[in-house]
């Protein structure tokens, strides 16, 4: 391992020990904000510290085994060779883990997020599939112990949704779900298809980090056009007799957000503003990323909703991720919220790309 990496790890261990000491300080314990911030830092440093300590132990084990290999006793030498082999394997494995733990973290990864699903091409079937995707993500959130709250929904006439925006609250929600952004295509026989022909429909998914109040962009009232209207359900029937639904247009960017799920206009406006802020920040981040992007692929997508990332093929029972050429034949499990088998390989590929980029710049 490079000396520069070892130095960085030693610095992190020193900070870990310092934070550990601070958490026992009565002044810190009495300051809830400071205690909370240090507790979060402690948990972030703990994993890399434990891994580095295991790496150092493996180095010590190797040195001890190499000394044992110099013994006159043949049985001891054979035992030493086994220990040398085990120690070298542990050192290699732990060095790889440490490199991943040292990769630059997205500051948004620990945040809650907004999940936006829109029906695309495919008519009624696209709306039904949007509903299926929302159910899939809801099941996944439940498995993770996350909370999911509908922010805004526009129901389709024959089931599902034209558009659905939900807030996902839980540890690391954005960091996990951000790889779901892009185009999702479904191939199946619709319930209304009498000839048994397979139809192709599509939905788009956008995942945006929730922005903490302290980091919210300044949105001037003069830059907003706010319309109120009556909330309506599928088929246009009115579900509310007051103008509680809100449509907010951010004039400088043309960003439009609607919210009609609450009976209170005030609550709908608050929800719409939260989504609007997330969209504005996301658009700015995508613009900056585009300015500095190179030829390296980006598994997070270009931000273009038309980027097709996944196909769900019902006749064959398969799901394919086009970014990493992965196909699994577990469609039913995936639609029941078992997404980890799809998410983990994408995260691993993303980390491999980050490591390759670091190696190029080293």
Swiss-Prot record:
Domain of life assignment: Bacteria
Alphabetical keyword list: Cytoplasm, Methylation, Protein biosynthesis
Cellular compartment(s): Cytoplasm
GO CC field: cytoplasm
Primary subcellular site in the record, as a coarse category: cytoplasm
Gene3D superfamilies on file: 3.30.160.20, 3.30.70.1660, 6.10.140.1950
One Pfam family linked to the record: PCRF
Example GO molecular function: translation release factor activity, codon specific
Reported modifications of this chain: Methylated by PrmC. Methylation increases the termination efficiency of RF1.
Residues recorded with modification N5-methylglutamine: 237
Function of the molecule: Peptide chain release factor 1 directs the termination of translation in response to the peptide chain termination codons UAG and UAA.
PANTHER family with a match to the protein in the record: LD18447P
Family recorded in the similarity comment: Belongs to the prokaryotic/mitochondrial release factor family.
Cited NCBIfam families: prfA (TIGR00019), PRK00591.1 (NF001859)
This protein's name: Peptide chain release factor 1
Gene symbol of the encoding locus: prfA
